[in-house]
């Protein structure tokens, strides 16, 4: 049996085809979305959990070496890896919030798959993280259908996050493909996420149109200019319908990080001075919230940086504020800070101002973010998103009849306004912002596996 599988940066979901229509399956708490989060007692627990409780083989030499190291480490640390040791979605977030210093927590592993300079053991570790999530999701789906799920069309961005170009894309897709096979999928096909979103929109069209799909996901923005309509239904070869592609490594997570940096980090002393009037370096505050950047987070949570932050507290004119950044380091609170920014961004979709509090850092720590503050904070990443629209139009050399806007950030009035100003007079359509890619992947799976 086949599924469409959106392994997303922010959320994961799967769909089957039922009576000619995509049906998204339940993932967590009756929701069709599983937030892309995972936690375990230690990083090493994930590899042992896969092998011990789900009989997932460590196929490659590096995976086998990782498993041996993991089992040895867990034994030395007296860590008992049980079936419930690895948690996913909101459950994992709850464990992390309860005890951030003692829980290994990962948000959006997809963000790291295209990172440059990953060592073989790091690639193996990310493969295990992805495999664990895929296995959990497949098992959740399997409880809702009678046939064995062993085929999947998996969505992928035009360009994965990372600076390595084609090499980064090959690395990331390779991790996803190997993880999917280890998680029990016999046949795996990939489809571009904006094309998949367009396929779901195409089902509503009664005539051929040039459709500009703008898919703003958690980690990337992908644009495709496509010929779509009834005459293209069920055709495996759609090369002539693809007029242009473009994609960049900016998505909803980057909007959240930008908002956290501009609006929340000043509460933690960013922009301050030493007692001698020397400006404090900005980099520690950026690294603190750059949760989709492996080197930045490694640098921030290093022991050397802990000592540096301690010295900075001592020298700062507003030592009490900088001490709050030190607390973020000490208690590993980066994800909670960025999640607070994300919640503020969502709240500002339908109100002029939002009151923000960060009691997990300090009981009375609070501020207000206005629409103007949001616009200022998001100006740079939003400009990069609009550049992708311009690139795909230049690539396709045609003007769209309609814009199909989808993805988790599609609800933002700022983004709709910016697109309307960039392409005046062209209607902007929307659908299921969180499910259109998954639905389109299920439609494509039916074409490819039937």
Task: Locate each region found by the language model.
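Early-domain small/polar-rich strand-loop-helix modules and first-structured segments
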Residues: 1-118, 251-281, 286-289
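Phosphate/oxyanion-binding active-site loops and adjacent basic polyanion-contact surfaces
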Residues: 105, 125-134, 168, 191, ...
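Phosphate/pyrophosphate-binding loops at sites that engage ATP/ADP/AMP, CoA/4′-phosphopantetheine
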Residues: 137-152, 385-402
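Glycine-rich beta-strand-to-loop/alpha-helix junction loops that act as flexible
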Residues: 156-157, 402-409
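Phosphate-binding glycine-rich/basic clefts of nucleotide- and phosphate-handling proteins
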Residues: 37-40, 64-65, 228-360
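Extended, hydrophobic alpha-helical segments in both membrane/secreted and soluble proteins
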Residues: 176, 209-224, 405-408, 415, ...
């Amino acid at each position: 049996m086949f599924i469409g599988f959106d392994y997303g940066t922010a959320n994961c979901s799967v769909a089957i085809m039922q009576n000619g229509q995509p049906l998204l399956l339940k993932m967590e708490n009756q929701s069709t979305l599983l937030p892309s989060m995972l936690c375990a007692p230690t990083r090493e627990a994930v590899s042992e959990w896969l092998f011990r409780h789900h009989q997932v083989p460590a196929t490659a030499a590096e995976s086998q070496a990782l498993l041996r190291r993991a089992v040895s480490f867990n034994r030395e640390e007296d860590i008992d890896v049980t079936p419930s040791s690895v948690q996913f979605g909101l459950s994992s977030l709850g464990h992390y919030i309860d005890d951030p210093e003692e829980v290994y927590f990962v948000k959006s592993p997809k963000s790291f798959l295209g990172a440059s300079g990953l060592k073989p053991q790091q690639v193996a570790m990310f493969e295990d993280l992805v495999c664990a999530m895929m296995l959990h999701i497949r098992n959740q789906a399997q409880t809702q259908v009678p046939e064995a799920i062993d085929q999947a069309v998996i969505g992928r961005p035009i360009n994965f996050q990372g600076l390595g170009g084609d090499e980064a894309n090959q690395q990331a897709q390779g991790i996803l493909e190997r993880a999917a096979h280890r998680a029990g999928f016999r046949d795996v096909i990939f489809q571009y996420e904006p094309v998949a979103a367009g396929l779901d929109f195409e089902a509503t069209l009664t005539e051929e149109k040039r459709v500009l799909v703008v898919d703003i996901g958690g980690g990337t923005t992908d644009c495709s200019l496509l010929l779509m309509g009834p005459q293209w239904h069920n055709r495996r070869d759609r090369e002539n319908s693809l007029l242009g592609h473009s994609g960049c490594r900016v998505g909803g997570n980057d909007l959240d990080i930008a908002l956290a940096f501009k609006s929340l980090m000043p509460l933690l002393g960013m922009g301050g001075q030493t007692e001698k009037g020397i400006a404090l370096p900005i980099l520690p505050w950026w690294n603190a919230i750059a949760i989709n950047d492996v080197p930045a987070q490694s640098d921030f949570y290093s022991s050397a940086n802990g000592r540096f932050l301690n010295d900075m507290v001592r020298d700062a004119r507003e030592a009490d504020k900088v001490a709050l950044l030190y607390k973020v380091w000490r208690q590993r609170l980066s994800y909670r800070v960025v999640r607070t920014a994300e919640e503020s961004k969502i709240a500002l979709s339908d109100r002029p101002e939002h009151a923000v509090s960060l009691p997990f850092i300090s009981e009375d720590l609070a501020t207000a973010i206005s629409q103007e503050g949001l616009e200022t904070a998001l100006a740079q990443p939003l400009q990069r998103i609009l550049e992708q629209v311009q690139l795909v139009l230049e690539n396709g050399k045609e003007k769209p009849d309609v814009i199909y806007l989808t993805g988790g950030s599609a609800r933002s009035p700022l983004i709709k306004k910016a697109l309307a100003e960039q392409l005046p007079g062209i209607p902007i359509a929307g659908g299921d912002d969180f499910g259109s890619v998954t639905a389109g992947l299920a439609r494509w799976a039916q074409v490819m596996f039937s």
